[in-house]
Each structure stands twice: as C-alpha cells, then as structure tokens.
Amino acid sequence: MRAADVIQAIGRGFNPDKTYTFFDDDLIMLEIIDLSQTASTSKELLRLKGRIIGKGGKTREIIESLIGVKMSVYGKTVSAIGHPDQILIVRTAMDMLISGATHGAVYSFLEKKKQDLMRSQLDSY
C-alpha cells in the first residue's frame, strides 16, 4: 500500500496506528465506495449506511471477520482495505446491501466466498 493510500485511508476514518501496518504489503489496496452516487436524499444515505453498519455494527463486523478486511463507514463513503480478491467480495456484498438484498442473503454469500478464499489459499501452497 502506498503512502498516498494510507493518507487517504486515514482521511476516510481508519485508525492511523492500524493503517500504518499496511505499508508492509504491496498487494493491499484501498477501495472507496461513494454512497452519495446511489442515495438521492440524506434520509436514503442514512438508511444505506445503517444497512451496511448493521445493528450495533454487526454487519460490518461480520464482513470484516469473514473476509479479513478492515472497513470504515464515514461521511458519504464506505471504505475497505484488503487484498484485491477480498475487495472484490466486499464490493459485491456492498452492492447487494445497497440494492436491498436481505442481510441473510449477504451473510450466506460471504460465507461461501470465505470458503472459496480459503480453498484458493490452500491451492496456492
């Protein structure tokens, strides 16, 4: 991860101390999803952020723990830090939540993708 990405990640709400640890891995990337492009009103933006965060942060925590990324919901954006294959999964999960998919369907998708990630990691050895 480049210095510019680390600075941008801090600006998107990530903890600076934890973000600096990403300097070590060149494959780590930052993905920023702008919710204002989807939400037409501030009320809809709040609803989307609520769906992504979940009750008590549950949905965000599930995504982070299953896929192994770090996420931040800040302002009008959702940001994720991870490897490209992880980011692709998070992006799809965010699109599902934004489109109105049930949380259960998103969790099932994430469980399946976690198994796929584990399989691909085992295959690479």
Residue ranges and their predicted role:
Residues 1-125:
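RNA-contacting regions in translation and RNA-metabolism proteins
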